[in-house]
């Protein structure tokens, strides 16, 4: 009997199955096809010729053997292999037909995944806070250019998987689960049929009373112990294949639930991180708000909700502002120019930084007074 055609078909299934499916295929080829073809035929080749009965009545042995084994063990197992592999072969044909019609879609999908880029990150310039503090009635730029650091191409994006995602991407998941269900049903059916036909033991002798036997006849079976061991091995192989089918169904179910939860979490994160779009190589920023008194809020100046500068920091800022103001007054008196002095003084970088520091100190003091009033109440 030639098994090459069936073996080649089953090898193709290996390319479109999960890790558990590959294990099932290995068990099927080694412990079923090879074991049945090599061991079964060598053990059962003389099952009818060595089945002898203590009678000389013509046709009695044939009738008694038919009562002993309505279906030969080897033929039963061959039929079992063919019927159990039929859903997998049908799935393979459907998969090859489906994939052959979608080569362009796969190429487009791979190109999209490679060309995906991360969304621009909101960035604020280093001198943005002090520019807002100038109060020079000039519109400050809302976008700033920043070089995007190069990252390793697709580093860490490739996730190891066992074929489940490939089956899902090709649109074969429903058909794959359906053929698993059919395989499991066939396994259960053949296990029950094998138990009904043969039980768990090959008896050494069989009592026959069928016609045309003239009386009750004792018949004897060749190598009953060896056949019993082989029968139990085939029971174990069938149970193992059924267990692998159930494990694969469980694996696909857990993987599908995990993918659904991961997709839901990803959608929630994307909905929370919706940002304004920006031109290429630019990062968009939002205009910072101001307090009711018209003073800007700086992210790094220590003045925010629920935060208050310590007393020694306030004293240090006062001393710093006092010294800076003295330097500016000295420079103002030494400058011989007239009207341009006020303009240059108000627009100098030192004046801008001092104004920012003064705003910072005022906000800290206001925050401290408000907290003390709340604590007094």
UniProtKB/Swiss-Prot annotation:
* Topology of the protein relative to the lipid bilayer: Multi-pass membrane protein
Extracellular side, ranges = 40-75, 198-228
Keywords of the record, alphabetical order, are:
Cell junction, Cell membrane, Gap junction, Membrane, Transmembrane, Transmembrane helix
> Where found in the cell?
Cell membrane; Cell junction, Gap junction
Q: Which residues cross the membrane?
A: 19-39, 76-96, 175-197, 229-249
**Per the record, where are the segments of Acidic residues compositional bias?**
131-151
Region entry Disordered, spans: 129-163, 265-294, 334-377
Q: Which GO terms describe its biological process?
A: cell communication
Q: State the protein's purpose.
A: One gap junction consists of a cluster of closely packed pairs of transmembrane channels, the connexons, through which materials of low MW diffuse from one cell to a neighboring cell.
Q: List the protein's name.
A: Gap junction gamma-1 protein
Q: Which organism is it from?
A: Xenopus tropicalis (Western clawed frog)
| The gene coding this protein | gjc1
């Amino acid at each position: 009997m030639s098994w090459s055609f069936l073996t080649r078909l089953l090898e193709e299934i290996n390319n479109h199955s999960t890790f558990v499916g590959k294990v099932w295929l290995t068990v099927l080829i080694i412990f079923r096809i090879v074991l049945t073809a090599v061991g079964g035929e060598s053990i059962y080749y003389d099952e009818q010729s060595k089945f002898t009965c203590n009678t000389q009545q013509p046709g009695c042995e044939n009738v008694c053997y038919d009562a002993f084994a309505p279906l030969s063990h080897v033929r039963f197992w061959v039929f079992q292999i063919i019927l159990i592999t039929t859903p997998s072969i049908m799935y393979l044909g459907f998969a090859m037909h489906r994939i052959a019609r979608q080569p362009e879609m796969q190429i487009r999908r791979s190109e999209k995944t490679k060309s995906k880029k991360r969304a621009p990150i909101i960035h604020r310039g280093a001198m943005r806070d002090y520019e807002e503090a100038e109060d020079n009635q000039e519109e400050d730029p809302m976008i700033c250019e920043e070089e995007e650091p190069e990252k390793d191409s697709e580093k860490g994006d490739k996730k190891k998987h066992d074929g489940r995602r490939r089956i899902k991407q090709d649109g074969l998941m429903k058909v794959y689960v359906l053929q698993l269900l059919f395989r499991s049903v066939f396994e259960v059916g053949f296990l029950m049929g094998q138990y009904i036909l043969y039980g768990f033991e090959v008896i050494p002798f069989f009592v026959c009373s069928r016609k045309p036997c003239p009386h009750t006849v004792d018949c004897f079976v060749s190598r009953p112990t060896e056949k019993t061991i082989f029968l139990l091995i085939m029971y174990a192989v069938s149970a193992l294949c059924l267990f692998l089918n159930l494990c694969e169904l469980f694996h696909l179910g857990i993987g599908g639930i995990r993918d659904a939860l991961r997709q839901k979490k990803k959608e929630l994160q994307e909905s929370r991180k919706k940002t304004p779009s920006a031109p290429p190589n630019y990062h968009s920023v939002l205009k910072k708000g101001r307090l009711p008194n018209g003073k800007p809020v700086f992210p790094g100046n220590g003045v925010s909700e629920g935060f208050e500068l310590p007393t020694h920091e306030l004293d240090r800022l006062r001393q710093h502002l006092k010294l800076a103001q003295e330097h500016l007054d000295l420079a103002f008196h030494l400058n011989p120019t007239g009207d341009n002095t006020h303009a240059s003084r108000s627009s100098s970088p030192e004046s801008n930084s001092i104004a920012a520091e003064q705003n910072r100190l005022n906000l800290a003091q206001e925050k401290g007074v408000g907290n003390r009033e709340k604590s007094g109440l």
